[in-house]
């Protein structure tokens, strides 16, 4: 078992038959007009749900969805999720509209084997984001076992993630968190070499802690996306109007020096797709070299950069990908991200994708199925990799006497 799971029980460690299992999931899926647009987080939760059902547990499930301000924000209702779960599980999912009520307590005695309870969006309750012990105790009163399988929310000290397991004796994790931590630990402990971290996205500042943690573990970095312009400017190269964090120029310069001093590699773009504005596809063109004209900004990496990055990725034994290479949501600026996604997919390496934008980029590229693991964690996976303790996991190591 991976190191990060030391002292934490899994759902397999409990006798579930006839027991009320409170299962905290991350069903925070994107929606448009009440329709689910990406159900990955739902399907990722199914193995634990099915296992609990097969073992004869009575299930009370819970999740958050978005950031509702009040209970009247019905666009954040879990109703579409409940309907989708019914289809996927071939079971009746009873949606309890008041998570803070005694309704589950009254429903549980007569719950049939193919019926499950899903609490409405827990963030409709004020006590959830306040880590309220009072709200948690209400749930604990009718629950025998607590299982957290919401990796994407485990970095938040919220009531159903933190306060609830703090008042329950029997607690552990589901299969999704077990897999997530095992995969992320493999990036920190004895990775197959060469090990390359592909970093992209907008800001260097968002990635500093992860870069620092990985610097002693990886063999090389590939840096693309808008954050690359800060590194290029730090080397005195012209980046035009591209997004640059001027307060991070010194850090970027020092980081390059530190990487090279450790005999590790850092690959930066050598050409770009540049244009006059981020929505301006008409003037988009590939630069001849690394320089970007004064009145232009970079929106993607160019073909020479894709070729360089792909050649390095072909040789890799382990790849961690976090962040797109350009504004991939615009098809005109997606070639860099999709080219790198293809190179990662074609590689024989262990390929782990972490961070929300990278997961979306992997999906959009059509290569998601070829990745070893795409983390459902977003912010949680980065916080874990940078060495932060996740409240939702740490509380599971504590024992109630």
From Swiss-Prot:
Q: Which PROSITE patterns has this protein been placed in?
A: PGLYCERATE_KINASE (PS00111)
InterPro entries per record: Phosphoglycerate_kinase (IPR001576), Phosphoglycerate_kinase_CS (IPR015911), Phosphoglycerate_kinase_N (IPR015824), Phosphoglycerate_kinase_sf (IPR036043)
Q: Which reaction does it catalyse?
A: (2R)-3-phosphoglycerate + ATP = (2R)-3-phospho-glyceroyl phosphate + ADP
Q: What is its EC number?
A: 2.7.2.3
Major site of localization recorded for this protein: cytoplasm
Please name the top-level EC class of this enzyme: transferase
Q: Which residues bind substrate?
A: 26-28, 41, 64-67, 123, 156
Give the metabolic or biological pathway.
Carbohydrate degradation; glycolysis; pyruvate from D-glyceraldehyde 3-phosphate: step 2/5
- Which compartments is it annotated to reside in? Cytoplasm
Which superkingdom, per the lineage?
A: Bacteria
- List the keywords (alphabetical): ATP-binding, Cytoplasm, Glycolysis, Kinase, Nucleotide-binding, Transferase
GO terms assigned for molecular function = ADP binding; ATP binding; phosphoglycerate kinase activity
Q: Name one GO biological process term.
A: gluconeogenesis
Where ATP is bound, by residue? 207, 298, 329, 355-358
Keyword Cell wall biogenesis/degradation listed: no
Coiled coil residues, start to end: none
* GO CC annotation terms, alphabetical: cytosol
Pfam families to which the protein is assigned, alphabetical:
PGK
Subunit structure as annotated in this protein's UniProt entry:
Monomer.
- Describe the family membership recorded for this protein in Swiss-Prot or TrEMBL: Belongs to the phosphoglycerate kinase family.
| Protein name, UniProt field | Phosphoglycerate kinase
Which species does this protein come from? Bdellovibrio bacteriovorus (strain ATCC 15356 / DSM 50701 / NCIMB 9529 / HD100)
